[in-house]
């Protein structure tokens, strides 16, 4: 059951919408200045707005990812786990990945502080 404030869910929905629209400035406005963001296809993390901007610019020059949140789960730690349907195409439009992935967010004072890629709990 989701116990997160609606404002946090709306924050995350807005971040996904900005990412999918390639509106970097709108997405960065939803993050803390020292945000930690995973380099999902390369490993490690980038930190801060300029590193996130550079990473996304590089990523979008190589692949065309689209991410849609399908469910939000509150965790005991206060973080939010998002079940995300991720479709990644190459620049020619061919699908190279179509899967559900987990994104775990830490929110600080109404802004995204950390995002991690993680496994989703099994539905078994």
Could you describe each region identified by the protein language model?
Residues 1-30, 123-124:
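Short, low-complexity N-terminal intrinsically disordered segments enriched in polar/charged residues
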Residues 12-15, 26-28, 35, 48, ...:
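Hydrophobic pocket/interface hotspot
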Residues 22-25, 38-43, 91:
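Short, charged low-complexity linear motifs
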Residues 36-46, 58-62, 118:
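A short gly/proline-enriched turn/hairpin at secondary-structure junctions
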């Amino acid at each position: 059951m989701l116990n997160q404030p609606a404002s946090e869910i709306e924050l995350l929905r807005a971040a996904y919408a900005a990412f999918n629209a390639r509106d970097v400035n709108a997405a960065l406005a939803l993050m803390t200045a020292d945000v930690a963001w995973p380099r999902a296809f390369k490993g490690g993390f980038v930190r801060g707005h300029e590193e996130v901007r550079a990473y996304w610019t590089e990523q979008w020059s190589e692949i065309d990812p689209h991410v849609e949140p399908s469910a939000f789960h509150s965790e005991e730690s206060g973080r939010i786990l998002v079940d995300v349907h991720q479709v990644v195409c190459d620049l020619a439009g061919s699908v190279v990945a179509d899967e559900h992935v987990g994104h775990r967010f830490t929110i600080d004072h109404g802004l995204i502080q950390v995002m991690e890629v993680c496994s989703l709990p099994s539905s078994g």
